[in-house]
Amino acid sequence: MERYESLFAQLKERKEGAFVPFVTLGDPGIEQSLKIIDTLIEAGADALELGIPFSDPLADGPTIQNATLRAFAAGVTPAQCFEMLALIRQKHPTIPIGLLMYANLVFNKGIDEFYAQCEKVGVDSVLVADVPVEESAPFRQAALRHNVAPIFICPPNADDDLLRQIASYGRGYTYLLSRAGVTGAENRAALPLNHLVAKLKEYNAAPPLQGFGISAPDQVKAAIDAGAAGAISGSAIVKIIEQHINEPEKMLVALKVFVQPMKAATRS
C-alpha cells in the first residue's frame, strides 16, 4: 500500500500525474507477458494494473476478453499468475502493482488466503470489479489485514453517500470511471469529471486515477487537468498486443511508442 503513497508524493514533487497501463497476465503467453510488463515500465509506466484471466469478465469489452482467451489458450492459471507477480516484484521493487479481478477468483482461494498470497508476492492493491462497496466488507477487511489496498470504482453518477463510502473504505487510489459501460478504447472517455474529483478530495479519498476509454495523450492530459492524479489505459494497450500477436519484437516496440507520449502527457 505504501508504494502508492510514495509514488503519488514523488509525482507531486515533480508536478506529474501517473500513467498506469493495464494488461492481462499471461497474454499472449507467460514469457512474452513478462517482456511486455518490463517494456511498459521502461517506457514510463508509473504503476501497473494487471488482470488475472477469468472465464466470465463482466466489465470487460471485447478487447480485454480476447486477451483473457489468449492467456487461457496459453494454459495460464491463477497459480502461474502469482508466480509471475513474484518475478515482477523481484525485478521492480518500488513500482505499485494492482490487480483488477473478479470475486470468483478470490472465493476460489478463500478470501483471506487470496489476500495473504497477494501480500506474499508484493501486490499493493486489489480491485474486485463485481463487488459493490456495500458488499465489500469481507474483501476490504481481509485486504487491510494483509496490507493490501482495497480499490473502489467511483462511477460518473455517484451520489454523495457513495462518494463518502468510497473515500472511507478505499486505500491506494480511487478508480474514477470516465463513463458507464464496458471497457474499450473505441468508447472515448467523455467529460472531465471535475465535480467528482472535487468531492472525493473534500472527503479525503485516495487519489483518483481515471480509467475506461483512455487511449490518447490528450485524454491523459484532460484527466489530470480535471484534477485526477493520473490515468489508466487498458484496451488501447491490449489492442497493440493483439495487432502484433505474431511479431513479438515489433509488439514491444509498438508498446513503447504508445506509452512514451502517454507518460509525457502527465507532465505539466
From Swiss-Prot:
InterPro entries (UniProt xref): Aldolase_TIM, RibuloseP-bd_barrel, Trp_synthase_alpha_AS, Trp_synthase_suA
Catalytic activity as recorded in UniProt: (1S,2R)-1-C-(indol-3-yl)glycerol 3-phosphate + L-serine = D-glyceraldehyde 3-phosphate + L-tryptophan + H2O
The enzyme's E.C. designation: 4.2.1.20
Residue numbers annotated as active site: 49 (proton acceptor), 60 (proton acceptor)
Taxonomy, superkingdom: Bacteria
Function: The alpha subunit is responsible for the aldol cleavage of indoleglycerol phosphate to indole and glyceraldehyde 3-phosphate.
Protein's name according to its UniProt entry: Tryptophan synthase alpha chain
Species: Escherichia coli (strain 55989 / EAEC)
Gene transcribed to yield this protein: trpA
